Amino acid sequence: MLRSFLLIVATVSLFGQCKPLPLATSPVSDAVRAPHRSTHETRFVRTNDEERGATMTLAGVLRDKAQTKQLLTSWLNSGKSVPSVSNKLGLKRMSLEQAIHHENWKALTTFQRMKSKKAKAYAKYGTGYQTEAKTKENLLQWVMRGDSPKEVSSTLGLLGLSRRKIIDHQNYEAFRTFLKYRKQWAEMQGNGFTKLTT
């Protein structure tokens, strides 16, 4: 257990000290890195007046990107399944070919991505759902920086919750992992280990 902790700490430390290697120069790589020169002042990426982000029509009302995101997030947090959202968007009884061309198709695919990302999540803090690897990397950084349990519980959204709510919270395991890493780091320092050397 201590070995794996040391390995993780060493890896995080090494990545922090790495510098990028210069690329070999060649006519091809120079051409790739050369700035793009165009006679046009603007670049049009969108076609057919398409909008970025998903919009949808629900109950005969067109929702803009912000409203669509709010509804999709609400459905995600309430545990709606992809088939139930497909039904709400009017796509369930359509063939795949018809559904792909429907105005709500992009909203459904956005919901599927959100659902998939949430399923892979280990904790939710900062910019949103985080993977287990990213969470553990952040936990180690917080330990090495000397963050207190109160600071970390605040970051993880656990501060001020009752014990029961903390145990049921999605970030509970991440907080327990932080406490474990913190204890291991204190033991290492007690044994004379003060810093990582490369």
Swiss-Prot record:
<keyword id="KW-0964">Secreted</keyword>
<keyword id="KW-1048">Host nucleus</keyword>
<keyword id="KW-0732">Signal</keyword>
<protein>
    <recommendedName>
        <fullName>RxLR effector protein CRE4</fullName>
    </recommendedName>
</protein>
<keyword id="KW-1035">Host cytoplasm</keyword>
<dbReference type="GO" id="GO:0030430">
    <property type="term" value="C:host cell cytoplasm"/>
</dbReference>
<comment type="function">
    <text>Effector that is involved in host plant infection. Contributes to virulence during the early infection stage, by inhibiting plant defense responses induced by both PAMP-triggered immunity (PTI) and effector-triggered immunity (ETI).</text>
</comment>
<dbReference type="GO" id="GO:0005576">
    <property type="term" value="C:extracellular region"/>
</dbReference>
<comment type="similarity">
    <text>Belongs to the RxLR effector family.</text>
</comment>
<feature type="short sequence motif" description="RxLR-dEER">
    <location>
        <begin position="43"/>
        <end position="52"/>
    </location>
</feature>
<dbReference type="GO" id="GO:0044196">
    <property type="term" value="C:host cell nucleolus"/>
</dbReference>
<feature type="signal peptide">
    <location>
        <begin position="1"/>
        <end position="20"/>
    </location>
</feature>
